[in-house]
């Protein structure tokens, strides 16, 4: 078992690393109509033009925090896949309990 710990799942011998695309500016994928729909769901009638970039910034920070915590839970459990429960626990840690996804 060559010292790989529990499971012994050695993923090959390393080999050449595949090139991973650098993801940047994906926050623009949160479109103006999508932000408008979220605001409508929250009961907003009129929306200032400056709101869209501000919303993208706030959403990015929020998601970075949740994902960082979820990945921490995943790494602690020595897994490589982030589960729904990791996200639920990350949200609970930040005081935003989410029901309906197990646990």
From Swiss-Prot:
Record-linked InterPro entries: CENP-T/H4_C, Histone-fold, Histone_H4, Histone_H4_CS
Modified residues (N-acetylserine): 2
Keywords: Acetylation, Chromosome, DNA-binding, Methylation, Nucleosome core, Nucleus
Localisation: Nucleus; Chromosome
Annotated protein name in UniProt: Histone H4
Domain of life of the organism encoding this protein: Eukaryota
Gly residues bias locations: 1-14
Known function: Core component of nucleosome. Nucleosomes wrap and compact DNA into chromatin, limiting DNA accessibility to the cellular machineries which require DNA as a template. Histones thereby play a central role in transcription regulation, DNA repair, DNA replication and chromosomal stability. DNA accessibility is regulated via a complex set of post-translational modifications of histones, also called histone code, and nucleosome remodeling.
